[in-house]
Amino acid sequence: QIALRKQGYPDMECQVVLTDEGSDTALLKVNQPLPSYLPVRERGYDLLGEQITTLGFPLTGFGSQLQVTQGNIAGLQGIGNDIRFMQFTAPIQPGSSGSPLLLPTGEVVGMVTHTIANTQNMNYAVKYQLLSALLTSCGLNVSELTHNISQTPLSTPQITKQSKSALWLVGCGA
């Protein structure tokens, strides 16, 4: 059993709609409307060096509150020049998988997937282009997910405040 969890809300059961083992991603469906969602970047430009913020729920055994980290996009390819991934420097821990990488505009440009143990800044995320393709393949219109893009850069506290209502912990089991 998979459920979305958030303090102050009842758990929402969800089903796996699509998985992509190669990129370590899954698309989940809930049978009720979510209060909000994050805008996904539609168009590309060179993201190398861009500041990013990650928001997620790592190491939930130590606490289930939202955690915020910052860094930069350090590389535009993954291990072995895999173009599905980008490398970033924001610190992550076990349980960070699925966390969004957000630009200062509040747009999702990636989703955390993995890190290389015992290294520094060897963290990877699936690029927004693959996320957009997965959403589109399930009949979702990504251009409708651009409602909340700031025209001016936001501070990290502003990004956090704007985004946190759309973030839920994905839990397995009772």
Task: Give the positions of each predicted feature.
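Catalytic nucleophile loop of clan PA
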Residues: 91-112, 124
